[in-house]
Amino acid sequence: QFWKVKMKNTVKITFWIMLTAAVVLGINAGWDKYQEFRQAELARVMTVKDKKFDPGQLTEMAAALAAKPYVPPADNLPDELKKLNYDQYRDIRFSRENGPWYGKKLPFEIQFFHLGSLFLTSVPINEIVNGRIHPLKYSPAYFDYGKNRLNTDELSELGYAGFRLHNPLNTRKYYDELVSFLGASYFRALGKHQKYGLSARGLAIDTAVQTGEEFPIFREFWLVRPKRNDKSVTVYALLDSPSAAGIYTFVITPGENTVMDVDAKIFPRKEINKLGIAPLTSMYLFGENTKNKFDDHRPEVHDSDGLLVLNGNGEWLWRPLDNSKYLRISAFVDENPKGFGLLQRDRDPAHYLDFEANYEQRPSAWVEPVGDWGKGWIELVEIPSQQEIHDNVVTYWVPKEKAVPQKELHYRYRLYWFTKLPVKKVPGDITATYTGIGGVSGMLEDHKRKFVIDFDILNMQKEVEKGIATLEVSASEGEITGKHLMYNPVTKGLTAYIDFKPNGKTSELRASVVKKGKNISEIWSYQWLP
């Protein structure tokens, strides 16, 4: 999709955002060059007699790929596959019994995605068994094409668009879908009793930059066949784009919270203006604090409702998501961040009233850096949207130091897909943010705004009444004209009321509950746009 959004200064920019898949056009000759490179590299590092696979071979391959000019994937699919609509594409299903791990009593199974519709790029997928690499070959006989009438004779050399892994996640008797890799460098996963929502990506390049965003692709995959008692499965992915190449290792462990241990080695081809590490992509259409109202019977529609940050100083920040008229870019400057993620905090089905989408069952995702990431900032991009089919929220870590050629970048992190946050934190979750006209009933002040914030802090009624627990509020622009903290008899927690008088400029507001000089809640961080 091309989004034309009007910035505050009325300058129009064109912002390219990938919502479901990257469609990268190329030429067949270019794809042949990659295949030649691939075969040469495999022959050089992997097919020496009696030499078994090790991950270092793939690192060498990624570095060699980055040293060569970028070759875009080919656009050589039959028209009948390109023209498939959403429902027609979904009608093509992989037959489970054709999976390479089916019937082997392994803890995981592989199933594949067919090419077609938005997914036009063939991705080689390999299996590693006892240290040997085996290509997983495509056959149209592996798929049920449903009501589609396709000439499968022309599809024999097609290849796959991506894959998914299944695991007895919710019951021992059934292999549930656990994780999928499909489109560009997108992937997503599930914990127990969750439904797909937000996604992650391997790398983000120049997001929300006027020159346009670049979407790296996973060029090839290697999956290590697990043993019968293994609790985890390992996937290697070769990343490629005009600006960089890299090798990614994913060690995936299913459970109540599914965990991915990610190791990313990135080799820039050129200087990159803005590099996004550990990007997360989600959807927020409207919710409790949305000023841009929708004519919709549902109270809320979103896959995530806030950004949670644990910065290098140990502060917990909560930024409620919004869908305004303007492109919003927020930067949380930090050094060695301890974690960040997009959360679906509201789990009440009555707040969504959508018993097909089940937004209350969407997973949250938390990025936990391993080692020091240095100086930089966590960036949040919120894009105006009118439909829930569009992912319009992106967050990632931006290193302060520019990525330059011939300098390898190495990032490790643990990525949790969860319902309940898997790390220890301060109490005082911010559970809701409401906003509206300032003043009180009968004395409204339309030049002011009122914010109401619910804190999940229990057993604090006496401390609030005695002034031991207080509310601290600040605004970078405008004026805080009133603040009040009270016990909430309905939630049994605390509720804050803030009156804010804007001055026509963008303002960063902060609020927290403080006791004896220390925060006993998350810090509410809110960006006000005129």
Where on the chain are the PLM-derived regions?
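A contiguous, surface-exposed recognition patch within enzymatic or periplasmic domains that forms
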Residues: 87, 180-182, 194, 273, ...
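Solvent-exposed N-terminal domain segments of exported/luminal and surface proteins
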Residues: 50, 55-211
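Terminal accessory/anchoring regions of large secretory-pathway or extracellular enzymes
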Residues: 39-86, 92-95, 113, 351-530
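Short, Lys/Arg-enriched N-terminal segments with co-localized hydrophobic residues
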Residues: 1-6
